[in-house]
Each structure stands twice: as structure tokens, then as C-alpha cells.
């Protein structure tokens, strides 16, 4: 048996500028607008110039990536919960 140190997830220091959020969901009209609207509720300083939208290779999915200033864990959890509640989001990274 080998001794391995406890592995802990990296700690984020808040506020964290340029924190990336990537949202993957079904491609469809208004998906990126919906993602931006939800994230702006929790991060009003969202710079839409950082918005990157990509289609999947077969066009079934869309990924939307933005950069925010993350203020705390509660903010990130609220963004995640609201995005998942839409029913259109498959994954939030």
C-alpha cells in the first residue's frame, strides 16, 4: 500500500477576473442569447466581446463560452443552476 497525499481541488481566489464559463446545449435559435441573458443576471459586468460560439461537427450542439468576474462560489452555483433549469443546457464547464 502506498501513501498518497490527499488531492484537493484547486482553490479559486475571489474575485477572479476572466473566469471562463462554457455552456453546451442543443443548437437552436436563441440559445446563445439565452445563455448570455442568464449569465448577465448574475454577472452584470459580462463583456459580450469575450463571447465565443461554436457549432459541433454535426451541427446538433452549440457551445457558448464567456469570461466573467467571478465573485464567489454562490454566484457560480446560481449561474449553473439557472442554466440547467432551462432544459436546453447539457453541460456547464
From Swiss-Prot:
Domain of life of the organism encoding this protein: Bacteria
SUPFAM superfamilies named in the record: YbeD/HP0495-like
Any Gene Ontology CC annotation: cytosol
Record family assignment: Belongs to the UPF0250 family.
UniProt-recorded name of the protein: UPF0250 protein PA3998
Biological classification of the source: Bacteria, Pseudomonadati, Pseudomonadota, Gammaproteobacteria, Pseudomonadales
Amino acid at each position: 500500500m502506498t501513501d498518497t497525499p490527499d488531492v484537493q481541488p484547486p482553490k479559486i481566489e475571489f474575485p477572479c477576473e476572466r473566469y471562463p464559463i462554457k455552456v453546451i446545449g442543443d443548437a437552436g435559435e436563441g440559445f446563445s442569447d439565452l445563455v448570455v441573458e442568464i449569465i448577465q443576471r448574475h454577472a452584470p459586468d459580462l463583456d459580450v466581446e469575450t463571447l465565443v460560439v461554436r457549432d459541433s461537427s454535426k451541427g446538433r450542439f452549440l457551445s457558448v463560452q464567456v469570461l466573467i468576474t467571478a465573485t464567489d462560489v454562490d454566484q457560480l452555483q446560481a449561474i449553473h443552476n439557472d442554466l440547467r433549469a432551462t432544459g436546453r443546457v447539457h453541460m456547464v464547464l
